[in-house]
């Protein structure tokens, strides 16, 4: 098993599947099973998403899979999950597999860190951002959401009542009633990330992206949080639709997936055809 050393001194396991142009995928390569898998299905998520992406891409690409989000949850980085450090971590993964050129695909906050990588290296052969706009990104809204999550995690940690006992059943994609199941340190690291991005000018950053790039989102990707979250709206599709013309002028290929929300647009049946066709037209072995 290959490993890479990350900025905090921890190591992350890496799986490599297939041959061809290298594609970094920050996903869990192993299907999740048991109660956690059932909870994910009820929420509308796929517990085998990473596995499905690998299966759908590894016949055409050298897929480098590593569970970066899972590693951050297992070994939180409450003070050090900064844009520069996450970019350094991604480069460490590429170095560990001997990739001097590679494409990167990430979804949601893992797309965001791909953008941070792209402006810090010339090693990218292509960048695909799903579920997060590369222009006019919701950085302020996400700071409010992650701050609220941290506050609720601290409150839960200070009570005797188990987190699992506090959770009513939720419907798939019901962001207004989403429950906090993470520790204060797990939540704090994302506050650190979005705090560091409050001064980030994603329009000015565009000139530093030198590789082919594509962004996509579901047309219904508008995440409305409830009162305990400050009634925050995290708009993903809005900036992509409104900025479609400008994004294309800046070199982006833009896809809006009709009728899909944040969870639906990340599923393998949506993502694999996009990545296969577009990457095949942009990069060669």
Regions found by a protein language model. Give the residues of each.
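A short loop-to-beta-strand scaffold at the N-terminal edge of the catalytic core in hydrolase folds
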Residues: 7-17
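Short beta-strand element of the alpha/beta-hydrolase
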Residues: 21-35
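Conserved alpha/beta-hydrolase
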Residues: 44-73
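Conserved acidic catalytic loop of the alpha/beta-hydrolase fold
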Residues: 84-102
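Flexible "cap/lid" loop of the alpha/beta hydrolase fold
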Residues: 112-119, 123, 127-155
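Active-site nucleophile elbow and catalytic-triad environment of alpha/beta-hydrolase enzymes
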Residues: 134, 187-205, 237-242
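Short beta-strand/loop motif that positions the catalytic acidic residue
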Residues: 209, 215-217
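Catalytic active-site module of serine/aspartate enzymes centered on a nucleophile-bearing elbow/loop
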Residues: 241, 248-285
């Amino acid at each position: 098993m290959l490993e890479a050393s990350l900025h905090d001194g921890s190591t992350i396991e890496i799986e490599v599947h297939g041959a061809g142009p290298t594609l970094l995928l920050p996903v869990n390569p192993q299907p999740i099973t048991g109660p956690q898998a059932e909870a994910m299905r009820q929420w509308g998520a796929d517990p085998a998403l990473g596995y499905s992406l690998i299966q759908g891409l590894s016949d055409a690409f050298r897929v480098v899979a590593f569970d970066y989000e899972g590693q951050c949850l297992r070994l939180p980085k409450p003070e050090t999950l900064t844009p520069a450090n996450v970019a350094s971590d991604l480069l460490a993964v590429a170095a560990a597999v001997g990739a001097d050129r590679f494409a990167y695909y990430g979804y949601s906050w893992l797309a965001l860190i791909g953008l941070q990588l792209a402006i810090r290296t010339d090693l990218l052969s292509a960048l695909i951002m799903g579920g997060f706009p590369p222009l006019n990104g919701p950085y302020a809204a996400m700071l409010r959401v992650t701050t609220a999550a941290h506050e609720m995690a601290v409150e839960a940690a200070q009570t005797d009542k188990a987190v699992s006992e506090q959770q009513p059943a939720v419907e798939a994609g019901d962001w207004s009633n989403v429950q906090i199941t993470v520790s204060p340190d797990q939540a704090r690291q994302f506050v650190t990330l979005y705090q560091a991005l409050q001064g980030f000018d994603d329009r000015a950053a565009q000139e530093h992206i030198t590789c082919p790039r594509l962004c996509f989102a579901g047309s219904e990707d508008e995440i409305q949080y409830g009162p305990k979250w400050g009634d925050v709206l995290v708009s993903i599709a809005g900036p992509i639709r409104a900025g479609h013309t400008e994004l294309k002028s800046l070199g982006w290929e833009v896809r809006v997936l009709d009728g899909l929300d944040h969870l639906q647009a990340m599923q393998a049946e949506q993502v694999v055809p996009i990545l296969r066709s577009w990457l095949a037209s942009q990069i060669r072995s």
